[in-house]
Amino acid sequence: MKKLIALILVALLALTCTACAEAYTITASAPSGAPALALATIAVNQPENFTFVAAETISAEFASAKADFIVAPVNAGAKLYKMGKSTYKLAGVVSWGNLYIASQKENFHLEDMNGAKVVLFGENTINAAVVNYALAQNGIVPASVEYLAGAAQTQALLLTDAEAIVVTAEPALTAAMMKNAAITAYAVNDLYKAATGYEGYTQAALFVKEETIQAQPEAVKAFIEAVAASCEQATTDVEAVANAAVALEILPNVKVATQAIPGCAVRFVNALDAREQIEFTANIDLSQFGGALPADDFYYVAE
């Protein structure tokens, strides 16, 4: 019954998004993969209004300013806004960390990272900064840290090198574990919580274009409510989100999607409620946020 109610709520809110402003259709963009899960159960019913792009091209979505909403890394949106290259305000955080430390090593424990080589992905990114912070705060000191380009590359190393210790991300981790049952994984979020008390870090957010806020305020509010409901389904109805993600080609298959989604830490927290944690994450490496904390006007507040 709870799943049915959630499905009905998402459907009604999605319809409201379109109906609340006559003849106005909300459009949205997101990087394909885990961040796009926040939109999946909405987008599957109106795919023509949603664009899913490669993660490395998300800055171009801000530059083009075509979409009303964009899901993107929090720091990317903050940095572009500070530089005056974006008018998109942060409406809410939707992704709270999908990073995992993994290895095929027999009886692998986090303490095994001490004095060992660890391979991360995304050098000079906020994800890497958070991992290094979490390790340091928990007294874990690798002998060396090396970097590969992305989670797909560390996943490949995890599968081919039985001695490797890597940081990868969902859903790549689940796909790897389905191929090799010897893999053991630990959530970076657990280390982060031990160090900070926070349930994950502010990884990706929903951004809304200032022009749309001014021209279609009710449509904006309705869409944000729909996204919040969609995010909730990632916890309450994983099957629905998995089916939607596969139909939209966000994730490869239902089996991987169903197992990976719980580890993607998808949940909606509005801008004002998330601000404290956004600023905490930013202070780990302010250079990733343009050298300063986001200003007050970066945050969307419904009137």
Where are these regions (language model features)?
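Short, glycine-/small- and polar/acidic-enriched structural segments
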Residues: 22-141, 145-147, 164, 170, ...
